Amino acid sequence: MNLYVVTGSTRGLGQALARQIAARGGDRLLTIGRAPGDATHIEADLAHAAQVERAGDELERRIAGAAFGRAVLFNNAGVIAPVGPLEKVDAAELERNLAVNFVAPILLMRRFLRATAGVALRRVVNISSGAARRPIFGWSAYCAAKAGLDMASRVVALEAAGRGLAIEVSSLAPGVIDTPMQARAREASAEDFADIERFKAIKAEGTLRPAEDVAADILRLEAEGRLAGDPIQDLRQIA
């Protein structure tokens, strides 16, 4: 039996990951997020560090004494707002973006690695973005947070290798997916989001991938051990 922990599981890619893990059976699934859920869910608003820490406590409590072949964390939760030139955006939205997209994944990596110290193989899959690797007009917070997550992933991988620990870390850009986050991005004005017409065209042309297909690719690659190696990865290059 393996352990899978998924954040942001109420919609989009996270929901697809959680559904497919649950459907195949045989493994332990825990989800973390602010919406209420079933017995596999740990409720926490990832914008608040204190709630993330409490989620870490609950994770430790729930898996105490259990034996797992491997443990996998999918840091998937994310928000796109605020969108617009930096001087125009709301400070509270800016803070929330950085908290959800950057601070929470790092805190959860920390608690996950502590909680699973006795597991022979541990994997962290941080859902990154192409926006981590190129600037996008109007996305200062999102780009910065995802770029920071890329670097944090590289550091954690380096620390694991330097101590001879079986910890594999991937910061994975999944490509363009048909999710609520994409829909919200298309609602912005051209003044705030210079790429708005390109994003609308991608939707109109039908080139956004269904979240279920992307989740299936990610889970297959994880099962095959193909998310190891270079921590900075792009699903479109390895699927």
Model-derived regions, located:
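N-terminal Rossmann NAD(P)H-binding glycine-rich loop of SDR-like oxidoreductase domains
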Residues: 10, 14, 18
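Substrate-binding pocket helix/loop in short-chain dehydrogenase/reductase
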Residues: 84-86, 93-95
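C-terminal helical subdomain
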Residues: 167, 171-172, 179, 187-239
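Residue(s) in the substrate-gating loop at a strand-loop-helix junction
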Residues: 129
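Rossmann-fold cofactor-recognition segment
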Residues: 38-50
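Active-site helix of classical SDR
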Residues: 109, 145
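Conserved glycine-rich Rossmann-like NAD(P)H-binding loop of the short-chain dehydrogenase/reductase
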Residues: 25-39
